[in-house]
Amino acid sequence: TVAACNSPKVGLDSDAELVR
């Protein structure tokens, strides 16, 4: 989810990955 930090569009996805 490191890329999610750089991409705001993937911000929501990063959250879901953290929950997993």
Curated annotation (Swiss-Prot):
A molecular function (GO) term: serine-type endopeptidase inhibitor activity
pH-activity relationship: Stable at pH values ranging from 3.0-11.0 at 4 degrees Celsius.
Temperature dependence: Thermostable when incubated at pH 8.0 at temperatures between 40 and 100 degrees Celsius.
Keywords linked to the UniProt accession: Protease inhibitor, Serine protease inhibitor
Keyword Phosphoprotein listed: no
Domain of life: Eukaryota
Role of this protein: Inhibitor of bovine trypsin with a Ki of 2.3 uM. Inhibits 50% of the proteolytic activity of P.rapae larvae midgut extract at a concentration of 20 ug/ml. Inhibitory activity against trypsin is reduced by 43% in the presence of the lysine modifier TBNS, but is not affected by dithiothreitol.
Misc. remarks from the entry: On the 2D-gel the determined pI of this protein is: 4.05, its MW is: 23 kDa.
Name of the molecule in the record: Kunitz-type serine protease inhibitor SOTI
